[in-house]
């Protein structure tokens, strides 16, 4: 019995020593470590799990100096796990001056929580600090008059915001600006400059894909650059993934007559009927922007698109026996 008591005393002394070592660490050092964790965490749980370890880590982990550095993946709350606690966490990050949090929470409030005024205000807060995705999202809102009526469209403001985002390197904004210049949409028409911007956007997108490819295959000598099937597609921003999950999960239903943007990497819904543009060829798909339309055309719609007049012709060519006869079509329509 004496031996057991002595062993227990040694274990208790060891635990106390470990605890004392942690308590001896200065708050500034722990905050510095937590800032690096918040920046590099691959998911919210990676960061929040550490905060649940003890009261001191929880207190220091919610320090504004830590939350202001929370990275995009740390803020990547999913629609499935959305709750008052996750909403509160994002608000704490916003109050700490985190511009990624301002953008993400702004998008969620604008499109998911039916609070367009607060959502636009948060996105504007991020845009003022030159946050490229926030600038682009605000430009889409201005182009469509989202959250208001059709008369609330402001094409000149949309072009200005889009140009600023493109200048900061946002590929979707660069592509959108190129289409605006080509079509003279909200800006004097300049076909050659618009074409140049579209080529530049495609080049940047290809460069990003190749960098990702090379980083994935740098240690595999059997793979070559000719194996384009493994070149990764453009990564979807976590907040766009949130929007997709929010409306596709059945958690909430869109109001009657409202539609989602058909581009798989977007997730934006209409805020009023007939807000988004339709494909002028088939009329079956809808897009919040020319950029989304161009990306979806290249990814899948080019194969799926069938002219409306084909269906009319097919209906007219149904014979008396109920069987359809062959109808020739012209498949040379371009990107719409």
UniProtKB/Swiss-Prot annotation:
Domain F-box: 19-70
Alphabetical UniProt keywords: Metal-binding, Zinc, Zinc-finger
Residues that coordinate or bind Zn(2+) 2: 279, 282, 301, 305
Binding site for Zn(2+) 1: 263, 266, 288, 292
Domain of life where this protein originates: Eukaryota
ZnF bounds (MYND-type): 263-305
GO-annotated molecular function: zinc ion binding
PROSITE patterns attached to this UniProt entry: ZF_MYND_1, ZF_MYND_2
InterPro entries: At2g35280_TPR_dom, At5g50450/At1g67340-like, Sel1-like, TPR-like_helical_dom_sf, Znf_MYND
Pfam families linked: Sel1, TPR_27, zf-MYND
UniProt cross-references to PANTHER family, sorted A to Z: MYND DOMAIN-CONTAINING, MYND-TYPE DOMAIN-CONTAINING PROTEIN
Protein name: F-box protein At5g50450
Organism of provenance: Arabidopsis thaliana
């Amino acid at each position: 019995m004496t031996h057991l008591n002595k062993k227990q005393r040694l274990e208790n002394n060891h635990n106390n020593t470990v605890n004392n070592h942690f308590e001896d660490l200065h708050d500034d050092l722990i905050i510095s470590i937590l800032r690096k964790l918040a920046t590099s965490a691959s998911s919210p749980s990676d960061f929040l799990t550490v905060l649940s370890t003890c009261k001191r880590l929880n207190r220091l982990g919610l320090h504004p100096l830590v939350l202001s550095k929370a990275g995009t993946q740390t803020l990547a709350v999913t629609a499935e796990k959305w709750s008052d606690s996750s909403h509160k966490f994002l608000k704490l990050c916003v109050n700490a001056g985190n511009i990624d949090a301002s953008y993400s929470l702004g998008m969620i409030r604008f499109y998911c929580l039916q609070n367009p005024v607060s959502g636009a205000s948060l996105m504007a807060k991020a845009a003022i600090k030159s946050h490229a995705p926030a600038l682009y999202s605000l430009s889409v809102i201005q182009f469509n008059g989202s959250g208001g009526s059709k008369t609330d469209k402001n094409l000149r403001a949309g072009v200005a915001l889009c140009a600023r985002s493109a200048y900061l390197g946002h590929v979707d904004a660069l592509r959108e600006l190129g289409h605006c210049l080509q079509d003279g949409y909200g800006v004097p028409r300049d076909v050659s400059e618009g074409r140049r911007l579209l080529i530049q956007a495609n080049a940047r997108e290809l460069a990003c894909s190749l960098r990702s490819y090379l980083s994935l295959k740098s240690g595999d000598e059997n793979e070559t650059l000719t194996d384009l099937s493994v070149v990764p597609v453009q990564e979807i921003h976590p907040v766009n993934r949130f929007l997709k999950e929010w409306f596709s999960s059945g958690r909430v239903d869109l109001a009657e007559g409202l539609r989602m943007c058909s581009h798989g990497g977007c997730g934006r819904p209409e805020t009023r009927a007939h807000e988004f543009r339709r494909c002028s060829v088939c009329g079956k798909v809808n897009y919040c922007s020319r950029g989304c339309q161009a990306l979806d055309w290249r990814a899948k719609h080019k194969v799926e698109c069938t002219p409306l007049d084909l269906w009319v012709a097919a209906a007219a060519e149904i014979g008396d026996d109920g069987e359809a006869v062959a109808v020739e079509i012209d498949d040379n329509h371009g990107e719409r």
